């Protein structure tokens, strides 16, 4: 034997980290003890079901671990005939399912891919960079699967953002600073790359002061025939594509696997990666080209671990030439090149004969592509630097993840002593038993208006519009549901919905993504909290118009550092067990997830966190929003007769049927704040009110309402007609339909003989107990008054002069030609081209290349030629050159000052009566 090289030690430290290899979730559980309680029998029954499933699947000889528990639900559902659309391949960077997409009235087979990602550690250290690369990393996972990412969601957790700065814990940034800068970072990256972030929610819980929760979830899609899945063979070449390599992010994977202490803020800053959204936008453009993706045998994105992981995972045997890795600057040694986590890089494995063609296609998209490795027959990973072999390890050893780890588990007893007959019953029992000071105070109040204002002013129920409006929700022109609905844009959407990214055609196919999680319930009972997270995420999609049969889940687990404490291990054990029971009960499987198991700071721990994300494919004609639509419509409450999973499923099926029948004008799933929270949020969007039915008393308004639905019916429908419809469809068993009242034009809520002024409630909701002071969005009365007094601008003059230019060039239809130049940082060229196509023009999208001086000269000449062959120049928006130096569009204007381009533009505008348009950066140019 020999002593290991330094680079080998650093690679093993990275490769075997909890972040990269889920070592906590794969730790072998040697014993599981359930503490004595009224719930012991139910928990033990859940464990017995898990063991039964293991036996049915032939997995009883596999190590018993959290990873097995987290993934076995989907395995079981697939075995019994569900989840048939799941794509199974060697590439598993993102969840991937086959879906049928309507393209111009014809079905096409596509892959829908989705992924959630956390950047808790880097965001806690450097909020802007950590949050921005959270989104960048999330995008690259489906992107490596060849999908075009078109939707993003952000769910975060913070401590007390009102805490005075002087009371901040030593070694910590103020919570308000983290929240603001993280929002700026995430939104900056999304806005630059051109990704619509249509659902944003921040959760507040005092225990997130231990370490922030920063989750990004994205959805992408690609036509299935454009994706090639093959195992790389000996002799295949690995290209490094995209950004160059620097020292940023070194140690990020290992740092993310550690708990924090008072020194972390000072010692971990270099572990935070530096995002470069315009570079990743180029990768998105390249991977959207079928002639590119059909060359790729296998792809992996550069995230944690850099070269050692991204390339190291592509094949069993690899010879990697670190000298070939493009560098941001000189001075990097072999170890740094091997484990740097510089962003916006992709590794692709190609057949040798395809390398030159791929590099040429990459250059067309202004991207560098460099051969850096060769696949070998021998299963060893070797890295060479400056003539020396600095890594030479066997695949078997690398894949071992180090010595096996073992732990004992003690599942804690629930805080209450209530009896439950099933997992579902337990989840509802825990929800009702949970003490909520806000709800308790509300229930003690005599005034309905005071109660509603107090409830809606709570920070976790209040409007977060000031935060949401920092994110671009419309880029890509595919958004179906805006973040806030109604004429007043105030009712929060329950899920994000967008059309699939079909180029050159029309589609009615949409995807949806929702989430569920309550940190207070999960802290009270992790088992019930996880179960209810799944239920809530599914209910939100049902209310939005999707069908449970088409739904899939992915989980985000985030827990304290478990150490060797059985009680600490019991929390994720209980949560993942609860989530498993929910999957089995509702027939919806989790086919992906991300675990982060280092949420501790000194003696502080994050709350037990299992966020459930639910996604589905559907048709735009079924999409339903929660805001009330019209006065005079009847409102019903669809619930279940008992807290059994079969009854909840029956309720889901009933709502799906009613939406499909076309009689639902608005639908909202119930919230922890009860009917009161649901009704107020539904009312504010259009400024409508509710007159409650005489059978509804005030106490019912504030009871938790998870899994239930408030529905506004179409004209002529009421509770009785709904019951008849459900009976005729055989869907009425165990479903409870209650008349809630009517929608009114008066902006007030009437219930139990009391009247609440919803304007007063809305004001409390928008103030959010001070949340508006952190994320303001409303203008002051003085500003509104000034805006209302601005005089109207009108123009009266001669008609536009007649067109005197030459005959229009192009096809026989005489359609005008449009050139759309794409500069580094532009991001709405697809939207612009589609708009011109709809108007009858013929657009040409041209990517400006600035990789070398010769490339700039060639781009200058080509753009000038295209302008002379066109009647319109359209400069798309975005963030060209990162809007630097000194503001927007400087790079674009500099390029247009080139003599050839200037002369072509002058000829277009002055000699040929052509047009020049711009949006965002393009308008500024």
Would you name each region that the model predicts?
Residues 1-881, 895-906:
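Glycine/proline-enriched, intrinsically flexible loops and inter-domain linkers
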Residues 880-925:
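Cysteine-nucleophile active-site neighborhood
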């Amino acid at each position: 034997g020999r002593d290991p090289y330094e680079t080998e030690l650093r690679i093993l430290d990275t490769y075997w980290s909890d972040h990269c290899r889920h070592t906590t979730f794969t730790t072998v559980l040697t014993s599981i003890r359930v503490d004595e309680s009224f719930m012991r029998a139910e928990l033990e029954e859940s464990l017995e079901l898990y063991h039964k499933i293991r036996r049915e699947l032939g997995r009883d000889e596999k190590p018993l671990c959290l990873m097995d528990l987290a993934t076995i639900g989907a395995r079981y559902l697939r075995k019994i005939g569900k989840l048939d659309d799941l794509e199974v391949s060697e590439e598993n960077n993102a969840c991937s399912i086959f879906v049928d997409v309507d393209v111009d009235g014809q079905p096409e087979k596509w892959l829908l891919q989705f992924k959630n990602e956390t950047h808790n550690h880097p965001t806690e250290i450097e909020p802007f960079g950590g949050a921005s690369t959270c989104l960048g990393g999330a995008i690259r996972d489906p992107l490596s699967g060849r999908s075009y990412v078109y939707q993003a969601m952000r769910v975060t957790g913070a401590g007390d953002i009102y805490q005075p700065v002087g009371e901040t814990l030593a070694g910590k940034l103020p919570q308000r600073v983290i929240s603001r800068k993280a929002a700026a970072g995430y939104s900056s990256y999304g806005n630059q790359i051109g990704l619509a972030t249509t659902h944003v929610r921040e959760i507040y819980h005092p225990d997130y002061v231990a370490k922030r929760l920063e989750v990004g979830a994205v959805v992408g899609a690609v036509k299935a025939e454009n994706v090639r899945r093959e195992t790389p063979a000996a002799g295949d070449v690995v290209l490094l594509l995209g950004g160059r390599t620097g020292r940023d992010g070194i140690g990020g994977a290992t740092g993310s696997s550690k708990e924090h202490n008072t020194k972390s803020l000072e010692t971990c800053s270099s572990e935070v990666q530096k995002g470069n959204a315009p570079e990743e936008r180029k990768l998105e453009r390249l991977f959207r080209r079928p002639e590119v993706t059909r060359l790729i045998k296998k792809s992996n994105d550069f995230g944690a671990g850099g070269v050692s992981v991204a390339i190291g995972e592509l094949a069993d045997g690899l010879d990697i030439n670190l000298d070939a890795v493009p560098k941001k600057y000189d001075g990097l040694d072999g170890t740094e090149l091997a484990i740097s986590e510089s962003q916006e890089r992709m590794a692709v494995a190609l057949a040798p004969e395809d390398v030159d063609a791929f590099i040429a296609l990459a250059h067309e998209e202004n991207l560098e592509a460099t051969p850096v490795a060769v696949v070998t027959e021998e299963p060893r990973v070797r890295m060479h630097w400056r003539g020396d072999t600095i890594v030479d390890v066997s695949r078997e050893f690398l894949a071992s993840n180090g010595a096996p780890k073992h732990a004992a588990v003690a599942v804690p007893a629930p805080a209450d002593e209530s009896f439950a007959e099933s997992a579902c019953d337990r989840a509802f029992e825990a929800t009702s038993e949970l003490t909520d000071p806000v709800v308790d105070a509300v229930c003690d109040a005599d005034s309905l208006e005071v109660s509603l204002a107090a409830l809606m002013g709570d920070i976790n129920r209040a409007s977060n519009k000031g935060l949401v409006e920092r994110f671009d929700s419309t880029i890509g022109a595919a958004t179906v549901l805006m973040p806030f609905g109604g004429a007043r844009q105030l009712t929060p959407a329950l899920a994000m919905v967008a059309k699939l990214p079909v180029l050159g055609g029309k589609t009615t196919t949409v995807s949806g993504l929702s989430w569920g999680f309550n940190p207070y319930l999960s802290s009270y009972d992790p088992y019930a909290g996880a179960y209810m997270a799944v239920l809530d995420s599914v209910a939100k999609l049902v209310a939005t118009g999707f069908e449970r049969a088409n739904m899939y889940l992915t989980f985000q687990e985030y827990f304290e550092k478990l150490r060797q404490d059985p009680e600490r291990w019991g929390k994720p054990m209980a949560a993942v067990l609860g989530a498993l029971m929910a999957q089995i009960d509702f027939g919806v499987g989790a086919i992906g997830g991300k675990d982060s198991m280092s949420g501790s700071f000194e003696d502080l721990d994050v709350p037990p966190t299992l966020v459930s994300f639910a996604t589905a494919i559907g048709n735009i004609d079924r999409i339903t929003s929660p805001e009330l639509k019209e006065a005079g419509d009847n409102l019903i409450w669809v619930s279940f007769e008992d807290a059994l999973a079969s009854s909840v499923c029956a309720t889901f099926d009933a709502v799906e049927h009613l939406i499909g029948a076309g009689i639902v004008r608005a639908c909202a799933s119930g919230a922890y704040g009860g009917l009161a929270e649901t009704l107020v949020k539904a009312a504010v969007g259009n400024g409508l009110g509710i007159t409650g039915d005489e059978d509804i008393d005030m106490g019912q308004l504030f009871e938790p309402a998870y899994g239930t639905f408030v529905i506004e019916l179409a004209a002529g429908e009421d509770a009785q007609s709904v019951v008849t419809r459900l009976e005729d469809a055989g869907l009425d068993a165990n479903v409870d339909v209650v008349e809630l009242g009517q929608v009114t034009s008066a902006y007030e809520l009437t219930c139990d003989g009391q009247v609440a002024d919803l304007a007063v409630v809305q004001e409390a909701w928008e103030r959010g107990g001070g949340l508006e002071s952190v994320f303001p969005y409303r203008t002051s009365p003085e500003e509104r008054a000034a805006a209302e007094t601005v005089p109207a601008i009108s123009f009266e003059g001669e008609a536009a002069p007649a067109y005197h230019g030459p005959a229009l060039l192009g096809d026989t239809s005489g359609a005008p030609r449009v050139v759309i130049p794409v500069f580094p940082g532009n991001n709405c060229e697809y939207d612009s081209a589609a708009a011109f196509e709809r108007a009858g023009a013929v657009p040409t999208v041209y990517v400006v290349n600035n990789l070398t001086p010769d490339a700039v000269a060639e781009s200058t000449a080509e753009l000038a030629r295209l302008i002379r062959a066109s009647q319109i120049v359209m400069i798309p928006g975005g963030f060209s050159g990162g809007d630097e130096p000194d503001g927007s569009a400087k790079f674009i204007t500099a390029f247009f000052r080139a003599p050839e381009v200037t002369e072509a533009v002058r000829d277009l505008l002055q000699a040929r009566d052509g047009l020049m348009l711009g949006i965002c950066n393009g308008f500024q140019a």
